[in-house]
């Protein structure tokens, strides 16, 4: 029987972040995952962007999340080796004079994220921007596959990665057991693939489709408006569709058509579609992460619900989860599973 402080089940963005934070704290960690089952991180474009939505508002907790996003991935690169963190400006064309005026008079709270606001066409040779646009900073993309693979190999080189499927962890008074592994605590970071013991969690699968395209010329920046074009050398990832309900597994002609039309309305550069992918992102009813302890088994915990913003949410809340496990802090109310208190009624 091999003994560890922590067993992390699932190794997408959430599991990778948590496992690294615990390792940095000097704890023994074993990570268990079957990479072939990962349907979210494996197709993620990895974009992190402080400005979000049709109304171009600041993303939730941006002033806290984004500084730590930079700190975490740079440290992760030094730890596991390789390059997967790519800070890069994003250009968002304006859709109207009104939108242009709004951002020309943006207040000081936007200073950390606005590189430049232009009232005239800036990249008109590549995109449709008759009203100008804004160049955002403190943004970019993470090569998620490379990050996850590098983290997996780092733990594997230390004999702390197991390629297997887990759904039957046995809780005990002083920890948990699974096959030949005993750990003081287990944390499930399995996204939409919930084990039976956590089936009460309100994780909502959110389907997304992406395209892999080859452009006739290389875009100058990351372009983002209704659709994004993120480098995935030598190609680009275009995404993503957003289907919270009534979705079917697999890629669809409708998904491809939607992305192609949005891309054509944003970027003038001719392109060829090379591939199409789909995945399920774990969302929650209020679109906030979900951290906490099983109501019956105190040694069984979970870190889930990162949705469409996992690249920026995973580092910050992975650290918060690690602090909680190490008794160095609490899980804040906005992400604590206790906010869905009615889910616990059957355990009381």
PLM feature spans:
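C-terminal catalytic lobe of FAD-dependent flavoproteins
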Residues: 275-348
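Helix-loop-beta segment of a Rossmann-like dinucleotide-binding subdomain
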Residues: 54, 82-92, 116-153, 163, ...
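Active-site substrate-recognition segment that forms the wall
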Residues: 14-25, 34, 42, 47, ...
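Short beta-strand to alpha-helix junction loop
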Residues: 56-68, 134-150, 250-254, 312
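Dinucleotide-binding Rossmann-like beta1-alpha1 core, especially the glycine-rich loop
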Residues: 47-125, 130
């Amino acid at each position: 029987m091999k003994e560890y402080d922590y067993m992390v089940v699932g190794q997408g963005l959430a599991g990778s972040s948590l496992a690294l934070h615990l390792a940095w704290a000097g704890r023994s960690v074993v990570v268990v995952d079957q990479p072939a089952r990962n349907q979210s991180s494996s197709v993620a474009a990895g974009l992190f962007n402080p400005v979000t939505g049709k109304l171009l508002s600041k993303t939730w907790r941006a002033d806290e999340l984004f500084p730590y996003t930079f700190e975490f991935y740079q440290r992760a690169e030094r730890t596991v080796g390789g390059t997967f963190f790519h800070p890069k400006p994003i250009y968002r064309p304006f859709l109207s004079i009104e939108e242009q005026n709004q951002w020309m008079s943006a207040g000081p709270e936007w200073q950390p994220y606005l590189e430049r606001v232009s009232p005239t066409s800036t990249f008109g040779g590549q995109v449709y921007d008759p009203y100008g646009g804004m160049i955002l900073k403190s943004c970019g993309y993470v090569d998620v596959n490379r990050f996850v693979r590098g983290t997996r190999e780092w733990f594997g080189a230390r004999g702390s990665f197991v390629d297997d499927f887990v759904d039957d962890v046995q809780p005990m008074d002083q920890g948990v057991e699974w096959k030949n592994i005993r750990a003081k605590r287990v944390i499930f970071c399995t996204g939409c693939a919930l084990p039976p013991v956590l089936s009460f969690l309100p994780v909502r699968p959110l389907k997304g489709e992406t395209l892999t395209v080859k452009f006739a010329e290389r875009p100058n920046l990351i372009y983002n408006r209704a659709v994004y074009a993120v480098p995935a050398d030598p190609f680009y990832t275009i995404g993503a569709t957003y289907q919270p309900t009534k979705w079917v597994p697999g890629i669809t002609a409708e998904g491809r058509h939607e992305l192609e039309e949005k891309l054509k309305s944003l970027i003038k550069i001719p392109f060829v579609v090379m591939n199409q992918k789909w995945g399920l992102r774990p969302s929650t009813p209020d679109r906030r992460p979900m951290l906490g302890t099983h109501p019956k088994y105190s040694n069984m915990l979970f870190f889930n619900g990162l949705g469409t913003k996992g690249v920026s949410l995973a580092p910050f809340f992975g650290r918060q989860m690690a602090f909680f496990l190490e008794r160095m802090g609490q899980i804040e109310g906005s992400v604590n599973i206790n906010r869905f208190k009615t889910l616990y009624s059957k355990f009381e």
